């Protein structure tokens, strides 16, 4: 299906109770349980709810991937990525024009936990080679960047990162998802 079709039809089965054709917004904090710990698919909205589940399925289908996770904010998503992929002593390489919130997350939260952070001009082949030579766990780029809107060659960065044993994380806040 085309992205436009996926966006409006994928995972949009009529609600069995109301017959709604579009998943309604689940504006509740808790869901009924048949017994303590025995729920009907959802327990608390903070862990999942029908609205978020449908959104994740639709976005995954539009991107052509198996799974998707949505978060309440971009920084929450970034925190999850960093916490899940980087350990104390490992290096994260970012660009100099990194979004300020991401910079502060690295400096104020992850550096005190032992994660190392280096800013390098990843558009410059010599600076990129030097940064990759330091053995980073992650290369972190925004494309386009915030605030300067610099665009990186993601395919080239991914290939070089892979060759050097690093992961590439791309924040595409300003780019459309598909």
PLM features: what roles do these ranges have?
Residues 113, 163-164:
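Helix C-cap/helix->beta junction micro-motif
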Residues 19, 59, 77, 92, ...:
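Buried hydrophobic positions in well-ordered alpha/beta secondary-structure cores of metabolic enzymes
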Residues 138-156, 166-178:
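Conserved PLP phosphate-binding loop immediately N-terminal to the Schiff-base lysine helix
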Residues 87, 132-139:
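Short acidic/histidine-rich motifs immediately flanking catalytic phosphotransfer sites
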């Amino acid at each position: 299906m085309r992205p436009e079709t996926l966006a409006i039809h994928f995972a949009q089965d009529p609600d069995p109770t109301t017959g709604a054709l579009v998943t309604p917004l689940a504006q509740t904090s808790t869901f009924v349980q048949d017994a303590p710990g025995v729920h009907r698919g959802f327990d608390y909205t903070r862990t999942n709810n029908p609205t978020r589940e449908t959104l994740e399925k639709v976005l995954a289908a539009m991107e052509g991937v198996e799974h998707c996770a949505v978060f309440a904010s971009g920084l929450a998503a970034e925190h999850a990525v960093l916490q899940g992929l980087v350990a104390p002593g490992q290096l994260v390489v970012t660009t100099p024009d990194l979004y300020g919130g991401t910079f502060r997350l690295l400096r104020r939260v992850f550096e005190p936990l032992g994660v190392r952070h280096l800013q390098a001009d990843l558009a410059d082949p010599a600076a990129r080679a030097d940064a990759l030579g330091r053995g980073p766990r992650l290369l972190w780029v925004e494309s386009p960047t915030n605030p300067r809107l610099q665009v990186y060659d993601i395919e080239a960065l991914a290939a070089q990162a892979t060759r050097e044993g690093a992961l590439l994380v791309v924040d595409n806040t300003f780019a459309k998802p598909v």
